[in-house]
Swiss-Prot record:
Modified residues (N-formylmethionine): M1
Family: Belongs to the complex I subunit 3 family.
Keywords: Electron transport, Formylation, Membrane, Mitochondrion, Mitochondrion inner membrane, NAD, Respiratory chain, Translocase, Transmembrane, Transmembrane helix, Transport, Ubiquinone
Name recorded for this polypeptide: NADH-ubiquinone oxidoreductase chain 3
Keyword field contains Ribonucleoprotein: no
Coiled coil: none
EC top class named in words: translocase
GO biological process: mitochondrial electron transport, NADH to ubiquinone
GO MF: NADH dehydrogenase (ubiquinone) activity
Species per Swiss-Prot/TrEMBL record: Bos taurus
A GO CC term assigned to this protein in UniProt: mitochondrial inner membrane
Transmembrane segments: 3-23, 55-75, 84-104
Signal peptide extent: none
């Protein structure tokens, strides 16, 4: 019975929020809201914009390092070990791994911006 009540409550709340989300934007319509101009891009211009491959590589490198730091660095503290030496060794290993990979990217000129 409690499961049915929880499911019904969640379904009702989700449906209500979806209805409100579709209904609210239609209350105040003005010309800027209905125009296709968005974020400084001309919708009638060329769809082929120049793309910097160097920027793409730096952005991918940043994302990889960011994910490594966000996901791997808390791992030693989340392992629930009582041994402080093991926890510090794991943390030091991950930090050294990040430093070595950053040094490798730097020596391979993956972070250089000059063309």
């Amino acid at each position: 019975m409690n499961l049915m009540l929880a499911l019904l409550t969640n379904f009702t709340l989700a449906t209500l929020l979806v209805i409100i989300a579709f209904w609210l934007p239609q209350l105040n319509v003005y010309s800027e809201k209905t125009s296709p101009y968005e974020c400084g891009f001309d919708p009638m211009g060329s769809a082929r914009l120049p793309f910097s491959m160097k920027f793409f590589l730096v952005a991918i490198t940043f994302l990889l390092f960011d994910l490594e730091i966000a996901l791997l660095l808390p791992l030693p503290w989340a392992s629930q070990t009582a041994n402080l030496n093991t926890m510090l060794t794991m943390a030091l290993f991950l930090i050294i791994l990040l430093a070595v990979s950053l040094a490798y990217e730097w020596t391979q000129k993956g972070l250089e911006w000059t063309e």
